[in-house]
Amino acid sequence: LNKRCAGIGSFCGLPGLVDCCSGRCFIVCLP
């Protein structure tokens, strides 16, 4: 799943995932 967020993006507790948009984890989350 690809999600585009406006300047929001931080690593989740899961490897290979990025936390963005309402604290949800998405693969390859673009800032």
UniProtKB/Swiss-Prot annotation:
One MF annotation (Gene Ontology) recorded for this entry: toxin activity
Localization terms from the record: Secreted
Any one cellular-component term (Gene Ontology): extracellular region
Covalent S-S links between cysteines: C5-C21, C12-C25, C20-C29
Top-rank lineage group of the source organism: Eukaryota
Keywords linked to the UniProt accession: Cleavage on pair of basic residues, Disulfide bond, Ion channel impairing toxin, Knottin, Neurotoxin, Secreted, Toxin, Voltage-gated sodium channel impairing toxin
Entry text on domains: The cysteine framework is VI/VII (C-C-CC-C-C).
Function of the molecule: This toxin activates voltage-gated sodium channels. It shifts the voltage-dependence of activation to more hyperpolarized potentials but has only little effect on channel inactivation. It is active on Nav1.3/SCN3A (EC(50)=3.98 nM), Nav1.4/SCN4A (EC(50)=4.99 nM), Nav1.6/SCN8A (EC(50)=1.27 nM) and Nav1.7/SCN9A (EC(50)=2.42 nM) voltage-gated sodium channels. In vivo, it induces nocifensive or pain-like behaviors in mice when injected intraplantarly.
Family of the protein in this entry: Belongs to the conotoxin O1 superfamily.
Name listed for the protein in its UniProt record: Delta-conotoxin-like ErVIA
